[in-house]
Amino acid sequence: HQFEVLGTRLITTFSNNILNNNGFLRRTRPDGLDDRRDMQFMQNGRQVFKQVVPMVSDLIVDHCADEGIDPTGLKRLWLHQANTSMNDFIGKKVMGRVPEPDEQPNILQDYANTSSAGSIIAFSHHQDGLESGDLAVICSFGAGYSAGNVIVRKR
């Protein structure tokens, strides 16, 4: 399989809904402060969901618009593989309908959350069925928040 990269786009925005409360630095202090779980990675999952879904779907839709592509015509969405519900909402916002399973592959059941590699693993395993000229998106996103989007065309 060969693909042409038509465009890339990145976005980063700050959020207090995913953070580390100085926990990793506490371990290095000479005064021996206790290793407190409440000072480590914290995530407000509902708020993350509410902020990331529109951020990522807008990134994809706006990127497609800037490239002259109608996102409802995308043949495949290879999205970050951490939360199926989040991907389903993003897919629906981007495609204007609920994507079919082959249009938005899910690899969580086989690989779990592999961080930003999930979209590339999905891309690697789910290229069949695309024809020359078909347009697709690879999009990874995560904590902070950061997202990267790649629009590709099958050769």
Regions found by a protein language model. Name each.
Residues 53, 57, 75-155:
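Claisen-condensing/thiolase-fold acyl-transfer catalytic domains that form or cleave C-C bonds
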Residues 33-34, 40, 61, 100-106:
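Short, functionally important structural connectors and interaction interfaces within domains
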Residues 55, 59-67:
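Stable alpha-helical structural segments in soluble proteins, enriched in small hydrophobic residues
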Residues 1-50, 58, 154-155:
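Condensing-enzyme catalytic core mediating Claisen C-C bond formation in acyl metabolism
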Residues 46, 64, 109:
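Short, flexible active-site loop motifs that bind/organize anionic cofactors or intermediates
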